[in-house]
């Protein structure tokens, strides 16, 4: 039976799909966060005993402060400034909302995963998620990558929670990843493939029993992964795989170099990095336009080798690309915002990895998926993910880590109590032997 918390989380996540124009597009859920969390949730937090939440709050506050400083120095327009700052504010409020309702009710992670899936089914993909390469691939590839793949991944995660005792589920998840790669959804497939393999290694601890075994396991995984990658490239070059973004293979001088293919597939991130280096200290401001055409030329050079065009062809409505949450922070607001964002991402990645071995079996695949997906999203997904999908990963990782830490502390207390009881029993027996002659 659905309780109030479950219904609230379902409706809240679905509310991100209902948008209207208010100094840019804003959803019902974001407007709800701006009112509900500061008035209802934040006053209820027991900050004196919430050291982790204080660290996260401080990191977000520092990021927001550097963003405000950057926007002031750059002299950015008010609408763009408000849009950039709103993403950070909503990200923090989204995280706090989920942590508040998931605390003590880890089972609501299932409702959260289902809500993510339902949102994709009802509202589809956000156009901001699509890079220029994605649009150029056509409707079929975009439909697979931004609609079908996320739905299948969320459905699989939900099933892994329900049927967690089925020990071969991680391998099935890896097979799903291989299928998605072949069909053209390389990033979604790669995340699923890596998630399944890592989860399988964790569940079969013989692979992680010592450092030598762990190193050997990673070498084997890298070798197998590259062998599959080389086979995929050879089939694309032979014309046997033509789906999705396979055209990018032909743009590479050496397609068997995965880094070169990554540059072709995520050229906006590399261009964004160059834009970051051009204005290293305080960035270009939120959502800056490429008025000189410099970054448009770089994009064309990386996509099809055509690196020159006339000034009349420059689009003054072309935003400087980044397609990376982390790089985008530096490109927009400079190195201090970049480091602040990097700290936030690294903090949750570290907590997630620390929870791998102690996580409840029911949520092990989910945890590994969100950790790997968080890393990929931070590196190669647009800035809008910081307000919507990344707080979900933050909250899931935080709750699972807190639960594992609590279980460890409870186990330590039980062990201490048992040792004390055993010590008292031995002490009593010794005392009885020593005083036996007195009683007799």
Which residues are covered by each model-predicted region?
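Intrinsically disordered, low-complexity segments enriched in polar/charged residues with Gly/Pro
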Residues: 253-254, 314
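Cytoplasmic juxtamembrane interface segments
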Residues: 80-86, 207-213, 254-280
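Short, charged juxtamembrane terminal tails flanking transmembrane helices
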Residues: 435-440
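Long extracytoplasmic/lumenal interhelical loops at the membrane interface
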Residues: 259-263, 267-278, 282-333
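Hydrophobic transmembrane helix bundles of membrane-integrated enzymes that assemble
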Residues: 1-251, 318-434
């Amino acid at each position: 039976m659905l309780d109030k918390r479950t219904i609230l989380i379902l409706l809240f996540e679905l509310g991100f799909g209902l948008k209207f124009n208010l100094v840019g597009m804003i959803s019902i859920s974001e407007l709800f966060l701006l009112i509900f969390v500061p008035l209802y949730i934040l006053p209820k937090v027991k900050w004196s005993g919430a050291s982790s939440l204080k660290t996260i709050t401080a990191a977000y506050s520092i990021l927001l402060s550097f963003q405000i400083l950057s926007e002031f120095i750059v002299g950015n327009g008010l609408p763009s400034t408000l849009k950039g700052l709103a993403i950070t504010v909503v990200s923090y409020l989204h995280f706090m909302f989920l942590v508040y309702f998931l605390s003590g009710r880890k089972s609501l992670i299932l409702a959260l995963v289902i809500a993510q899936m339902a949102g994709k089914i009802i509202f589809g993909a956000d156009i901001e998620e699509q890079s220029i390469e994605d649009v150029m691939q056509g409707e079929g590839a975009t439909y697979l990558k931004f609609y079908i793949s996320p739905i299948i991944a969320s459905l699989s995660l939900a099933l892994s929670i329900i049927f967690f005792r089925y020990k071969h589920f991680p391998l099935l998840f890896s097979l799903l990843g291989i299928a998605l790669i072949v069909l053209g959804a390389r990033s979604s497939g790669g995340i699923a493939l890596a998630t399944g393999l890592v989860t399988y290694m964790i569940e079969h601890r013989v692979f992680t029993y010592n450092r030598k075994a762990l190193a050997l396991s990673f070498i084997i995984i890298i070798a197998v992964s590259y062998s599959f990658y080389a086979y995929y490239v050879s089939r694309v070059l032979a014309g046997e795989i033509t789906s999705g973004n396979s055209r990018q293979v032909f743009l590479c001088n050496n397609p068997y170099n995965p880094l070169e293919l990554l540059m072709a597939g995520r050229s906006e991130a590399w261009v964004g990095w160059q834009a970051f280096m051009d204005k290293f200290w305080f960035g270009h401001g939120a959502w800056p336009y490429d008025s000189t055409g410099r970054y448009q030329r770089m994009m064309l050079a990386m996509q099809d080798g055509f690196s020159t065009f006339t000034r009349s062809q420059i689009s003054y409505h072309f935003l400087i690309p980044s397609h990376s949450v982390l790089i985008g922070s530096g490109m927009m607001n400079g190195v201090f915002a970049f480091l602040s964002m990097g700290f936030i991402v690294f903090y949750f990645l570290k907590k997630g990895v620390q929870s791998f071995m102690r996580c409840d079996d029911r949520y092990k695949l989910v945890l590994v998926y969100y950790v790997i997906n968080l890393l990929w999203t931070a590196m190669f997904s647009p800035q809008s993910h910081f307000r919507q999908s990344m707080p979900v990963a933050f909250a899931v990782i935080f709750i699972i880590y807190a639960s594992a830490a609590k279980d460890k502390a409870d186990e330590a207390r039980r062990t201490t109590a048992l040792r004390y009881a055993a010590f008292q029993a031995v002490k009593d027996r010794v005392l009885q032997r020593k005083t036996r002659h007195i009683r007799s």
